[in-house]
Amino acid sequence: MPPPGDQDCARRRSRRRRRDLLLSQLCFLASVALLLWSLSSLREQKELDLMDLIGEDRKWMVGRKLMQVNDTLTSEDAGLQSSKNCTEPALHEFPRDIFSNEDRRQGAVVLHVLCAMYMFYALAIVCDDFFVPSLEKICERLHLSEDVAGATFMAAGSSAPELFTSVIGVFITKGDVGVGTIVGSAVFNILCIIGVCGLFAGQVVALSSWCLLRDSIYYTLSVVALIVFIYDEKVSWWESLVLVLMYLIYIVIMKYNACIHQCFERRTKGAGNMVNGLANNAEIDDSSNCDATVVLLKKANFHRKASVIMVDELLSAYPHQLSFSEAGLRIMITSHFPPKTRLSMASRMLINERQRLINSRAYTNGESEVAIKIPIKHTVENGTGPSSAPDRGVNGTRRDDIVAETDNETENENEDNENNENDEEEEEDEDDDEGPYTPFDPPSGKLETVKWAFTWPLSFVLYFTVPNCNKPHWEKWFMVTFASSTLWIAAFSYMMVWMVTIIGYTLGIPDVIMGITFLAAGTSVPDCMASLIVARQGMGDMAVSNSIGSNVFDILIGLGLPWALQTLAVDYGSYIRLNSRGLIYSVGLLLASVFVTVFGVHLNKWQLDKKLGCGCLFLYGVFLCFSIMTEFNVFTFVNLPMCGD
């Protein structure tokens, strides 16, 4: 395990980077809201035609909701429903808004949009700074392996907003907003994250076939099971239980991932492809031994922009002696570990190595002149293969030169150790500055002050209600952090769904469309930005695998767990009814997106580049357009119009 100081430093830098990307996230959400508002006029034009198309044979659909648990209606309810040819909005399940519908149409809905965006930001802060650290402490106390922890607690931490949105959709709104959010988030994670990483990574990244195929195959099985269960527009108790059991099987697969991977390599003869699926690795003496320095020390063949500092390329050309923690980090980014673990370990390793290279006295202007201390037996010439000259060292230097460089290196190491100690002291002094903002300590700088003022209400509330278990004096209170952060995630998710429901009702947009577009983007954009940061450092393989692997939790637990609680615990023997028949088409597109993505990666020779990125973003646009038009009854009748005031 890496030192606690390295873990804290990596987490703080990741959280600060995600806060810096807040503006781009809000702009993206605003553009999605504008698109939905422009498309709402299409629904208003078709409402009159739909009223004529609704016949007597469709009156049984009137007033259906997601949580209708039986088909028995009283005569009074039947008469009330038969008199309506519209769907009751989920807005009535929430407290009354202070603005009327007319006020919102005149411009007050902008306040609800801003409030929803603020809830997106609040969820990201609570999950990153409080909820996930508390889950890490729980995993440490339970002595869980990295595989099981990544597939259970860490997956719950990254998908907490989607899970709570689904719970609210089942037990409160009794609509399709939860299902739409998870379906839209799943497509966003597959197509949009891969597309953004391919366009803006600044390089061509090779992808590992094992991780992509493993997660894609099981994810495909999950989506197929979901399609089969919702095809008849209702979900029974045993169907929801099957979804939960499938996730338990996924945990077992991750537990024995290394053994399964070895069998896969033996069958495909792909042994030796350890990092990013690279097939053209340099040969190394004594390859039978497991050497942690092999990982990420082979130079990749990719194109990059000059503005991107490639840490792994510098390490390939100028390796150094690894400490125990550094060797552990490099082992844990191999394909023997789950995507969640690999993504986390890669982020920590990249930050540590880049900081080391920047702080090195010999590292100037992007060119490293660090002397490499390598035994003569394993001398490498030009970094490509074993040297044929017995009296030559690294890059053609003689043994005498190596001895002299070794003496100089010893002196440099002593100086570097002193510099590292000073750097550690500086990092300890900056501990309070990084991480979540504190309400009583405004930062310096105009931009930071604006961010601090923007987040002050959130920081004030969290400062007094959620202990920060990252700090040593609050570390023992990690269970309190877990409980309080869970409550805040539930509260923020409730506010988020409430605001989005009001926005959809005001613009005449169904709840399922708001879930597929606005809620899905709001809960997934932070993960997209984090994956982009990792992909720009050459770790696109882990970003892609993480985006697909996290969807397994969303489908099997995000939907299966709330359904199982309702049909087994709350009302045993009941079933879940789906309000929108268009969801089956959206889930079908979700399944198609998996096949198209894997097939596109295969045709692109398992490389992530701009061409693949553009294709994925185009497919995501097609999915949004098709889903929106389907829910608006453009192709066929799937939804009754929403009831007015």
From Swiss-Prot:
Residues 128-151, 203-209, 256-486, 534-551, 604-617 are cytoplasmic. Keywords: Antiport, Calcium, Calcium transport, Cell membrane, Glycoprotein, Ion transport, Membrane, Phosphoprotein, Potassium, Potassium transport, Repeat, Signal, Sodium, Sodium transport, Symport, Transmembrane, Transmembrane helix, Transport. Alpha- repeats lie at residues 148-188, 520-551. Residues 1-43 form the signal peptide. One of its GO terms (molecular function) is calcium, potassium:sodium antiporter activity. Glycans are attached at residues 70, 85. Residues 404-435 have a biased composition (Acidic residues). One of its GO terms (cellular component) is plasma membrane. The keyword Magnesium does not apply. GO terms for biological process: bone mineralization; intracellular calcium ion homeostasis; negative regulation of gene expression; positive regulation of gene expression. The keyword tRNA processing does not apply. It catalyses: Ca(2+)(out) + K(+)(out) + 4 Na(+)(in) = Ca(2+)(in) + K(+)(in) + 4 Na(+)(out). The chain crosses the membrane at residues 107-127, 152-172, 182-202, 210-230, 235-255, 487-507, 513-533, 552-572, 583-603, 618-638. Residues 44-106, 173-181, 231-234, 508-512, 573-582, 639-645 are extracellular. InterPro entries: K/Na/Ca-exchanger, NaCa_Exmemb, NCX_ion-bd_dom_sf. The modification Phosphoserine is found at residue 307. Residues 379-398, 404-442 are annotated as: Disordered. Abundant in the brain. Highest levels found in selected thalamic nuclei, hippocampal CA1 neurons and in layer IV of the cerebral cortex. Expressed in dental tissues. Pfam families: Na_Ca_ex (PF01699). It is a multi-pass membrane protein. It comes from the Eukaryota. It is found in: Cell membrane. Belongs to the Ca(2+):cation antiporter (CaCA) (TC 2.A.19) family. SLC24A subfamily. Calcium, potassium:sodium antiporter that transports 1 Ca(2+) and 1 K(+) in exchange for 4 Na(+). This is Sodium/potassium/calcium exchanger 3. The gene is Slc24a3.
